Amino acid sequence: MVNSLTTPEPQTLKPGVKAPVQETLLTPRFYTTDFDAVANLDISANETEIRAIVEELRADYNRHHFVRDEEFKQSWDHITGEKRRAFIDFLERSCTSEFSGFLLFKELSRRIKSRNPLLAEAFEFMARDEARHAGFLNKSMSDLNLSLDLNYLTKNRTYTFFPPEWVIYTVYLSEKIGYWRYILVHQHMQEHPEYQFYPLFRKFESWCQDENRHGDFFKALLRSQPQLWKNWKARLWVRFFLLTVFVTHTMTVFERASFYESIGIHPRKYNNRVIQETNNTSARAFPLILNTNHPLFFWRLEQCWENNFKLAAIKNSKLPNFVKFFQRIPPATAIFWNMLRLFLIKPIDTEATRGTVL
C-alpha cells in the first residue's frame, strides 16, 4: 500500500480557467539558461549524428497524429470524484511540463539562430512538438470544463536558471523518462482496454516517439561535449542528476497514486519499471548509470517519499509555524540521509563497455 495525498479540488482564476498548481519541488518548473554559451557550443565532435537527428525532427512524423477525432466529441461528466480530480491534475502537470519545454526551446531557437543555426533548427522543431503536446493536453482539460491560461503561466511562473550543462543533463533525462512513462501506459492500455476511460491514452504511442527523438538529440549533443562525460566531475554530476530525477519521479508517482490506480496501474511497480528502463537507456549517453539492482535502492527511494509525505502533513497541519519548523527537521534529515546513501552506492561504469552499449 502506497501512502498518497488526496487530490484537492481544482481552484479557478475565473470561470473555466484553472489556477496554476502551487509551485513546489514536485511541480513542473520553467527554466532559462545562458543562451550565449549554448550558441558557442562546438558540436563538431558529433555533428554527423546531430544532423541526422535534426533531419528526423524535420520530417515531423507525428504531424497528423494529434487530431481530436469523433471519440473526443462527447460529454465527460461521467468522470467524477477523485478519478476526475486526479485526471485533471495529471493533465495540468503534463501540460505545464510540455509548455515549459516549448518556452525554453523556442527561446533557445530565437536567441542562437544567427550563431548556431543547426542547433537553433533542432530547438525550433522540438518547440513545435512541445507546443503541439501542450495544446492537445489543454484541450483535453477543456473537455472537463477547465483549461490553463498559458499566457498567464508565461508571465507569472517563476523561472529557474540552469547553466547549459545542467539543461543538457536534465532535459535528456526528462525526455527519456517521459518516453518510458508514456510507452508503459500505452502498453498497459493495449493489454487492458477496459481502463482506457478517455481517448487521450490512444495518443501515447505517438507521444512517446516524440519524447524519444528529443532524448536522442540531447544524447547526441551531450556526447559532442567531452567535458560532460569524460572526467571525474562529470561522473559526479551524472550520478547527482540521475538520482535527483529518480527521487523526484518516485515522489511524483506516489503523490499521484490515485491516478495510476484509476487506470489499473500499480504505482510502485510502474515507478520501479520506469526508473529501471530509464537508467538502462541512459547508458547510451552517460559514462555511468546507477545500480538499481542494489537491494536497498528502491527502498531508499520510497523512504524519501514517505518522509516527504510527512512533510506535506506537517505543512497542512494547523500547528504554529515554530512547531512545524522543528517537526520538519527529522523527515527533511531523513530525505537527505537516504539520498546520500543512494548517491554512495557504487555506480555501473558504462564507458568500459561503450562498444557493446551503443
From Swiss-Prot:
Keywords: Chlorophyll biosynthesis, Iron, Metal-binding, NADP, Oxidoreductase, Photosynthesis. GO terms for molecular function: iron ion binding; magnesium-protoporphyrin IX monomethyl ester (oxidative) cyclase activity. Signal peptide: none annotated. InterPro entries: AcsF (IPR008434), Ferritin-like_SF (IPR009078), Rr_diiron-bd_dom (IPR003251). One of its GO terms (biological process) is photosynthesis. Pathway: Porphyrin-containing compound metabolism; chlorophyll biosynthesis (light-independent). Pfam families: Rubrerythrin. It catalyses: Mg-protoporphyrin IX 13-monomethyl ester + 3 NADPH + 3 O2 + 2 H(+) = 3,8-divinyl protochlorophyllide a + 3 NADP(+) + 5 H2O. The keyword Acyltransferase does not apply. CDD domains: ACSF. Its EC number is 1.14.13.81. It is an enzyme of class 1 (oxidoreductase). Its cofactor is Fe cation. Belongs to the AcsF family. Catalyzes the formation of the isocyclic ring in chlorophyll biosynthesis. Mediates the cyclase reaction, which results in the formation of divinylprotochlorophyllide (Pchlide) characteristic of all chlorophylls from magnesium-protoporphyrin IX 13-monomethyl ester (MgPMME). This is Magnesium-protoporphyrin IX monomethyl ester [oxidative] cyclase 2. It comes from Nostoc sp. (strain PCC 7120 / SAG 25.82 / UTEX 2576).
